[in-house]
Design a protein with these regions (language model features):
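Extended, largely alpha-helical regulatory/partner-binding modules appended to the mid-to-C-terminal parts
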Residues: 1-160
Length: 160
């Protein structure tokens, strides 16, 4: 298996041998292995969707960012999983923005995409997004699962 897939399995299993083994079995049972297949099996968000989501935030497009979020949730991805993956994405984006390019487990193509996307944000905006989405993760008792994430989107996009 490619290194990227093994990295995704390790991240999703959070150190649990049993969970990692279950994810590995699911993936190995597939005839074709590509990023979309692996991501859907691991109930995650693919890199391209994270890029689109970040681009909508960079454009301060509240409506499209929330629609993209709700589309992911309709596909069965939990708000918590979206937040966790987006925080990791933002962390990588921040590192690229400040010139740290090593050992993200990303392809050269994805690193290039992050470098281009980093031009749409300044460091303080990336830090603000990290704080907002971290807060959304902490708000576990919301009556509407995606509400803290929607609020994070609106708060960032509606700020001058």
């Amino acid at each position: 298996l490619p290194e990227e897939i093994l990295q995704q399995i390790a991240e999703k299993s959070s150190g649990s041998y049993r969970d990692g083994f279950v994810f590995l079995e699911k993936i190995l049972s597939q005839k074709e292995l590509d990023e979309k297949t692996v991501t859907s099996l691991l109930a995650g968000v693919d890199f391209g969707t994270l890029v689109k989501f970040a681009a909508k935030l960079a454009e301060k497009d509240t409506k499209e960012a929330i629609l993209l979020l709700n589309n992911l949730i309709a596909q069965g991805v939990s708000a918590q999983a979206i937040n966790l993956e987006f925080i990791q994405f933002l962390r990588n984006l921040l590192f690229v923005k400040v010139g740290v390019f090593d050992n993200f487990g990303l392809t050269a193509e994805n690193l290039t995409t992050l470098a281009k996307l980093s031009d749409d944000f300044d460091q303080s905006q990336i830090l603000e997004l990290l704080k907002l989405f971290e807060s959304a993760i902490q708000a576990k008792n919301s009556p509407i699962a995606q509400l803290p994430t929607e609020l994070a989107i609106a708060q960032f996009c509606l700020k001058d």
